[in-house]
Curated annotation (Swiss-Prot):
The N-terminus is probably modified. InterPro entries: Ara_Isoase_C, AraA_central, AraA_N, AraA_N_sf, Fuc/Ara_isomerase_C, Fucose_isomerase_N/cen_sf, Lara_isomerase. Its cofactor is Mn(2+). It holds the Pfam family AraA_N. This is L-arabinose isomerase. It comes from Salmonella typhimurium (strain LT2 / SGSC1412 / ATCC 700720). GO terms for cellular component: cytosol. Catalyzes the conversion of L-arabinose to L-ribulose. GO terms for molecular function: L-arabinose isomerase activity; manganese ion binding. SUPFAM superfamilies: FucI/AraA C-terminal domain-like, FucI/AraA N-terminal and middle domains.
Length: 500
């Protein structure tokens, strides 16, 4: 069972009574066939639920009102099977607060050249019915997605499925609670921001809990629970000699297990699905939570270090979006560079907290080593390299008057040499279009040093995310040229200034 099983998407057909009862009967019959086929064959993440035809303003408004108040409804897919006068949709669309997708399709794929008549033409009017609906969306400044293609086309299935992921993610975000253990890392700017504005824009709440509250829960964990979790570690990871049963760091592993169990219990009791820590505020914890954070991220929790609640929330959002897809998604940080003409590389990592969902190894290494930051006992952590291939890094920043999402398309590569003295998980990548352009564009746009790294999602997913939340997006990819990128930032400043 996944988060998508908690939601459904309503399939709404637009028509009108002008065409008579027989045409409406055929429209309903077609709709039932299409919905059944999509649910059976399209591998959509959510179930489609067919609603009664929308043939009048009152019917359409009732459907939209019901969608707003049904917690299981993640959004609406609308198909204009016949012409559906768009003034009928104004009241409904004006109150609708769920995501909307217009499926611009028709029942038949090919025209019946020898038999086509006006009855056929009147029944299958998506081509201009969809344009009428599009006009009222544009006239009302209504943000909605559009997918064109036959309902049996796999590309259309993929695009509808991707939109469904966004719709569910948006509903989950409205309920998201972010827990900050301690406050922001002292004097750091980009990790701070306006939490009230974030809740207004996205719906997630951010609040702080004292580390002492967490420590109380951690200290309440019994040996039996710790032993059971240690057994799971033994079967899931390759333990170094120091962390094995008679190793000199075995107690550190037990303490890491205690912290993991305590953190998870605290988060579950509070209904949190994202959290932050900071190494400046660990009073009462014996070690920086490394292994605990890595494993909680793999279970779907959002996380970021140094109190960075925006990145923690974004990671949770992207975890939901990518549920069930191939490839992982993790907290990440651009850590250091390899400058080599034509082969510039970025080594990404963090002190400890990189999610094993992006690991190339089936069984990462579990080790305990010294950490020179935080002044605590040596922490446990998982060490691994990252899968290769296309990926993205994304950053959500607070510009005061709006939010900006930055996305850099990257290509992760195999580490050309072993890293015997680097005791942390890491990812190595080439930034698109090249490191100088990518880094300069990122810096000019104000991108954070913390990001969400993902093999599972791509630029199209993040464009949809920005659209569905109505925020700015700045893209750095192989098509990026700095002069044009700078111009786009200036134009966005004007556009969003007028939009306020």
């Amino acid at each position: 069972m996944t988060i998508f099983d908690n939601y459904e998407v309503w399939f709404v057909i637009g028509s009108q009574h002008l065409y008579g009862a027989e045409t409406l009967r055929q429209v309903t019959q077609h709709a039932e066939h299409v919905v059944n086929a999509l649910n059976t064959e399209a591998k959509l993440p959510c179930k489609l639920v067919l609603k009664p035809l929308g043939t009048s303003p009152d019917e359409i408004t009732a459907i939209c009102r019901d969608a707003n108040y049904d917690d299981r409804c993640a959004g609406l897919v609308v198909w204009l099977h016949t012409f559906s006068p768009a003034k009928m949709w104004i009241n409904g669309l004006s109150i609708l607060n769920k995501p909307l997708l217009q499926f611009h399709t028709q029942f038949n794929a090919a025209l019946p050249w020898d038999s086509i008549d006006m009855d056929f033409m009147n029944l299958n009017q998506t081509a201009h019915g969809g344009r009428e609906f599009g006009f009222i969306g544009a006239r009302m400044r209504q943000q909605h997605a559009v997918v064109t293609g036959h309902w049996q086309d796999k590309e259309a299935h993929t695009r509808i499925g991707a939109w469904m992921r966004q719709a569910v993610s948006k509903q989950d975000t409205r309920q998201l609670k972010v827990c900050r253990f301690g406050d922001n890392m002292r004097e750091v700017a980009v990790t701070d921001g306006d939490k009230v504005a974030a809740q207004i824009k996205f719906g997630f709440s951010v609040n702080t809990w004292a580390v002492g509250d967490l420590v109380q829960v951690v200290n309440s964990i019994g040996d039996g629970d710790i032993n059971a979790l240690i057994d799971e570690y033994e079967s899931s990871y390759t333990l170094t000699p120091a962390t094995q049963i008679h190793g000199d760091k075995r107690q550190n592993v037990r303490e890491a297990a205690r912290i993991e169990l305590g953190m998870k219990r605290f988060l579950e009791q509070g209904g949190f699905h994202a959290f932050t820590t900071t190494f400046e505020d660990l009073h009462g914890l014996k070690q920086l939570p490394g292994l605990a954070v890595q494993r909680l991220m793999q279970q779907g929790y959002g996380f970021a270090g140094e109190g960075d609640w925006k990145t923690a929330a974004l990671l949770r959002i992207m975890k939901v979006m990518s549920t069930g897809l191939q490839g992982g998604t993790s907290f990440m940080e651009d850590y250091t560079y390899h400058f080599e003409k034509g082969n510039d590389l970025v080594l990404g990592s963090h002190m400890l907290e990189v999610c094993p969902s992006i690991a190339v190894e089936e069984k990462p290494i579990l080790d305990v080593q010294h950490l020179g930051i935080g002044g605590k006992e040596d922490p446990a952590r998982l060490i691994f390299n990252t899968q290769t291939g296309p990926a993205i890094v994304a950053s959500l920043i607070d510009l005061g008057d709006r939010y900006r999402l930055l996305v850099n398309c990257i290509d992760t590569v195999k580490t050309p040499h072993s890293l015997p003295k680097l005791p942390v998980a890491n990812a190595l990548w080439k930034a698109q279009p090249d490191l100088p352009t990518a880094s300069e564009a990122w810096i000019l746009a104000g991108g954070a040093h913390h990001t969400v790294f993902s093999h599972a999602l791509d630029l199209n997913d993040m464009r949809q995310f920005a659209e569905i939340h109505d925020i700015e997006i700045a893209v750095i990819d192989n098509d990026t040229h700095l002069p044009a990128f700078k111009d786009a930032l200036r134009w966005n400043e004007v556009y969003y200034g007028f939009k306020r």
